[in-house]
UniProtKB/Swiss-Prot annotation:
Name the record gives this protein: Large ribosomal subunit protein bL21
GO cellular component: cytoplasm; ribonucleoprotein complex; ribosome
UniProtKB keywords: Ribonucleoprotein, Ribosomal protein, RNA-binding, rRNA-binding
Subunit structure: Part of the 50S ribosomal subunit. Contacts protein L20.
């Protein structure tokens, strides 16, 4: 069985036991988190939401809160002696999908 959930403005296909990286969630490590925005549930019986599936939830355990790899953003204006170098690390949450309730 699999499901498509929405979190952080993205749609993610998940299965039970899968580890996923999502945009940072405001929960502590070791806690459980429940996704209510389930857009699709597939498997033996297919359920399509309009826009979400009624009563369907996906439960996950928080493994880690972290920050992604550093990227460097460099902007400049030609012939103006104007340059700016800036770094960014995107925060993320690592989850393990425990159960899909449909």
């Amino acid at each position: 069985m699999f499901a498509i959930i929405e979190t952080g403005g993205k749609q993610i296909k998940v299965e039970e036991g899968q580890e996923i990286f999502v945009e940072k969630l405001d929960v502590n490590e070791g806690d459980t988190f429940t996704f209510d925005k389930v857009l699709f549930v597939g498997g033996d019986s297919v359920k399509v939401g309009a826009p979400t599936v009624e009563g369907a939830t996906v439960t996950a355990t928080v493994n880690k809160q972290g920050r992604g790899k550093k990227i460097t953003v460099f902007t400049y204006k030609r012939r103006k002696n104007s340059x700016r170098k800036k770094g960014h690390r995107q925060p993320y949450t690592k989850l393990t999908i425990d159960k899909i309730n449909a």
